[in-house]
Curated annotation (Swiss-Prot):
Gene: PIN1
Residue span(s) of domain PpiC: 52-163
Lineage: Eukaryota, Metazoa, Chordata, Craniata, Vertebrata
InterPro entries linked to this entry: PPIase_dom_sf, PPIase_Pin1, PPIase_PpiC, PPIase_PpiC_CS, WW_dom, WW_dom_sf
Protein name: Peptidyl-prolyl cis-trans isomerase NIMA-interacting 1
Post-translational modification: Phosphorylation at Ser-71 by DAPK1 results in inhibition of its catalytic activity, nuclear localization, and its ability to induce centrosome amplification, chromosome instability and cell transformation. Ser-71 is dephosphorylated upon IL33-stimulation of dendritic cells.
UniProt keyword Cell cycle present: yes
GO function terms (MF aspect): cis-trans isomerase activity; peptidyl-prolyl cis-trans isomerase activity
UniProt keyword Cell membrane present: no
GO cellular component, one term: cytosol
Function statement: Peptidyl-prolyl cis/trans isomerase (PPIase) that binds to and isomerizes specific phosphorylated Ser/Thr-Pro (pSer/Thr-Pro) motifs. By inducing conformational changes in a subset of phosphorylated proteins, acts as a molecular switch in multiple cellular processes. Displays a preference for acidic residues located N-terminally to the proline bond to be isomerized. Regulates mitosis presumably by interacting with NIMA and attenuating its mitosis-promoting activity. Down-regulates kinase activity of BTK.
Location within or outside the cell: Nucleus; Nucleus speckle; Cytoplasm
Amino acid sequence: MADEEKLPPGWEKRMSRSSDRVYYFNHITNASQWERPSGNSSSGGKNGQGEPARVRCSHLLVKHSQSRRPSSWRQEKITRTKEEALELINGYIQKIKSGEEDFESLASQFSDCSSAKARGDLGAFSRGQMQKPFEDASFALRTGEMSGPVFTDSGIHIILRTE
């Protein structure tokens, strides 16, 4: 139990049914990894709660027909289902994790957000500027860490914390 308490915020230890190995899952970012996460979710906190006042992230957004605005710079009317959007997101995550593609090139080609023109870079932001699930995931990530699928009213995101 003491081992669990030392995990960074949002992380929990789980057992893989397929490989019978322990892995770590972050319920805020939906990230999973075999290696035990170390340290705090951030360093140099400036807001008195052990987290930075601002973070910088890039993201790849896949919208679906239930998104709050089902259109993008890439497509006037988005008709894909939420399930199809999640399938695309999971495929992108696999390509990034395998090294087949890098985050920035996928974001610039396939993101439904206009930030695609900046390779997914959203710049720095503080709490209260983004939709809550996106914000929570962004602040829970460590610099250089990528989330799993993050669901917001805009669609499904992969978030990469860059600062």
